[in-house]
């Protein structure tokens, strides 16, 4: 699985992209530095393939700093870091 976001650092939005080789239930969530869930971008069954979702802070009261995005596909979990610069 290839998981990345661009641009990073970002403000006000970043595109998170990934590829998965198998079909399955996918969840993509964003967390703050304390582990609090900020957003759920994906929570559905998807086929194998390449995907991308945009994370935008427009309606969220988020401060500058480090955030994490986590992709879960079946038993697979990957977490990456991104930085919001205001």
List the model feature ranges, each with a label.
Residues 1-6, 10-31, 40, 52-59, ...:
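Glycine-centered coil/turn sites that cap beta-strands in beta-rich domains
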Residues 45, 59-61:
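Short, flexible loop/turn segments at beta-strand junctions in immunoglobulin-like
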Residues 48, 64-86:
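C-terminal tail/sorting-segment detector
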Residues 7-9, 45, 86:
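Short, low-complexity Ser/Thr-rich regulatory SLiMs
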Residues 38-46:
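Solvent-exposed serine/threonine-rich low-complexity stretches and specific carbohydrate-binding patches
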Residues 7, 38, 80-82:
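Generic secondary-structure boundary/loop-capping signal
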Residues 43-44, 53-55, 80-82:
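Generic detection of short hydrophobic beta-strand segments and adjacent strand-loop junctions
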């Amino acid at each position: 699985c290839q998981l990345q976001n661009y641009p990073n650092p970002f403000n006000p939005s970043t595109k998170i992209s990934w590829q998965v080789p198998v079909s399955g239930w996918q969840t993509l969530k964003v967390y703050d530095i304390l582990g609090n869930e900020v957003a759920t971008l994906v929570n559905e069954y998807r086929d194998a393939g390449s995907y991308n979702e945009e994370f935008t802070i427009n309606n969220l009261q988020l401060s500058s700093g480090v955030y994490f995005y986590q992709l879960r596909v079946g038993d697979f979990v990957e977490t990456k870091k991104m930085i919001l610069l205001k």
